[in-house]
């Protein structure tokens, strides 16, 4: 039953993105507010805090040019809802869901609460199916699984935007009968970055199966709190109403957390670590936990949030708390970036906790689990020997040690590195892994069973063919 709307002109204070309305009754937390100026301009807001006879309202379009005396506030009695429709595929919206691509307004099939419906943990299905991104360092070493939440930890100046666009363009589920979509939400990005994403999606045709939400750096910070929730609400609609497999890419979650800190400071809340609000963990969980699968439903939501680590500090509160909630991380390396390697994914600190359940026979290939373990071990050994060479010189190494050094160099140049438009199948990725392992003596392949070596090692594969 819809509550009656109430209008007030009793604004007592405006500061930052917030306004305080006095003398209100029956106002609820999260309620949508319509703000009207003397000139008739309308803006939207949401109740952040409701107390006896007083409400704190956050204004989505910002409070600039609002006058306390001539501005009226109407409490609608509804929570914030986003209009959803299959017609949203192929469209670009701003951070609060208004079309910015010159196309018509969306005629909604339904309106959904941006906070989503709580998902009973018992109703969740365990993620088990492989998603192919076409990027070897992810598919081969840190596999993405349907329903997983796998963040990318980046740093300022690293090519995470290019990586996000490449994943959005190339990601697919194997099997023609499966329908796949990408929901892309960018928060606090520059005009240059927004144009890059628009151009990348439109020129490659990826826009046809995508929904884009773009919140710009000069948009009000408060919009950044809404943007990822808008995107996830649309993703839930596509996944659970239309049985689609949806990949949600959120960038940059650091900008989201900065907006959270800004609003918390405006509300004069007691700060937590480094000034971020104490409830940031819970707030991030309300976003990340909307990934997953539901028993009895075909659709799924897979999340790849991207965040830039301030000062490349992986112990910073944002990556630290994100790591607690999500199921692994893809870490970008400044050292690899300096070497000219794209994408600069450092596979050693990277991890996909659900990888073991999404690979192997019937999913990728039977040799995948053992091959990945052997590649990890060999690359780790090569990296360790690099440090040793810096101390004792290469002359002190054995022939086998030199092979490991060669392997580490070629692994970075040939396996990790690939072109921006290079889309490798999982078979190509695994075969490339075996080619690199052939550098090492067969006696060093201790993590791969003999029958796998006989079947997939290039030396034996060429003989059988």
Swiss-Prot record:
Biological process terms in GO annotation: proton motive force-driven plasma membrane ATP synthesis
Compartment list: Cell membrane
GO terms for cellular component: plasma membrane; proton-transporting two-sector ATPase complex, catalytic domain
Principal cellular location given in the protein's record: membrane
TM ranges: none
Assigned keywords, A-Z: ATP synthesis, Cell membrane, Hydrogen ion transport, Ion transport, Membrane, Transport
Stored InterPro entries: ATP-synt_VA_C (IPR055190), ATPase_a/bsu_AS (IPR020003), ATPase_A1-cplx_bsu (IPR005724), ATPase_F1/V1/A1_a/bsu_N (IPR004100), ATPase_F1/V1/A1_a/bsu_nucl-bd (IPR000194), P-loop_NTPase (IPR027417), V-ATPase_su_B/beta (IPR022879)
Mode of membrane association: Peripheral membrane protein
Pfam families: ATP-synt_ab, ATP-synt_ab_N, ATP-synt_VA_C
Record's function text: Component of the A-type ATP synthase that produces ATP from ADP in the presence of a proton gradient across the membrane. The B chain is a regulatory subunit.
Entry's family note: Belongs to the ATPase alpha/beta chains family.
Name assigned to this protein: A-type ATP synthase subunit B
Organism: Pyrococcus horikoshii (strain ATCC 700860 / DSM 12428 / JCM 9974 / NBRC 100139 / OT-3)
């Amino acid at each position: 039953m819809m509550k009656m709307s109430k209008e007030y002109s009793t604004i007592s204070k405006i500061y930052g993105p917030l306004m305080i309305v006095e003398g209100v009754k029956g106002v609820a937390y999260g309620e949508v507010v319509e703000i009207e100026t003397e000139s008739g301009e309308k803006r939207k807001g949401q109740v952040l805090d409701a107390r006896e006879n007083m409400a704190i309202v956050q204004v989505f379009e910002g409070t600039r040019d609002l006058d306390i005396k001539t501005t009226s506030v109407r409490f609608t009695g509804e929570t914030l809802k986003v209009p959803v429709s299959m017609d949203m595929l192929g469209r670009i919206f701003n951070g609060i869901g208004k079309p910015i691509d010159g196309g018509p307004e969306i005629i909604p099939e339904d309106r959904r609460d941006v906070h989503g419906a709580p998902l009973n943990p018992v109703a969740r299905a365990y993620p088990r199916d492989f998603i192919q991104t076409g990027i070897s360092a992810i598919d081969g070493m840190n596999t993405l699984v349907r329903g997983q939440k796998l963040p990318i930890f980046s740093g300022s100046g690293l090519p995470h935007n290019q990586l996000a666009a490449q994943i959005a363009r190339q990601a697919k589920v194997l099997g023609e009968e499966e329908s796949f979509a990408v929901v892309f939400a960018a928060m606090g990005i520059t005009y240059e970055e927004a144009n890059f994403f628009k151009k990348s999606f439109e020129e490659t045709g990826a826009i046809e199966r995508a929904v884009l939400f773009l919140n710009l750096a000069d948009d009000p910070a408060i919009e950044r709190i809404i943007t990822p929730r808008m995107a996830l609400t649309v993703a839930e609609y596509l996944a659970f109403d239309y049985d689609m497999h949806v990949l949600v890419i959120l960038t940059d979650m650091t900008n989201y957390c900065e907006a959270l800190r800004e609003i918390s400071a405006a509300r004069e809340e007691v700060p937590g670590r480094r000034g971020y609000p104490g409830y940031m963990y819970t707030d991030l969980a309300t976003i990340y936990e909307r990934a997953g699968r539901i028993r009895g439903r075909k659709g799924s939501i897979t999340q790849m949030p991207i965040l830039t680590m301030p000062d490349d500090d992986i112990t910073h509160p944002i990556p630290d708390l994100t790591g607690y909630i999500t199921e692994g991380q893809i870490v970008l390396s400044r050292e690899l970036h300096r070497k000219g390697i794209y994408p600069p994914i450092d596979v050693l600190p990277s991890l996909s906790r659900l990888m073991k359940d999404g690979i192997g026979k019937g999913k990728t290939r039977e040799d995948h689990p053992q091959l990945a373990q052997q590649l990890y071990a060999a690359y780790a050994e090569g990296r360790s020997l690099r440090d040793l060479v810096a101390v004792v010189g290469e002359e002190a190494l054995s022939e086998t040690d030199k092979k490991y050094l060669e392997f580490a160099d070629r692994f970075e140049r040939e396996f990790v590195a690939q072109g921006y438009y290079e889309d490798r199948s999982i078979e190509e990725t695994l075969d490339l892994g075996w080619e690199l392992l052939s550098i090492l003596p067969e006696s060093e392949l201790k993590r791969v069973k003999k029958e796998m070596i006989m079947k997939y090692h290039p030396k034996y594969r060429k003989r059988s063919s």
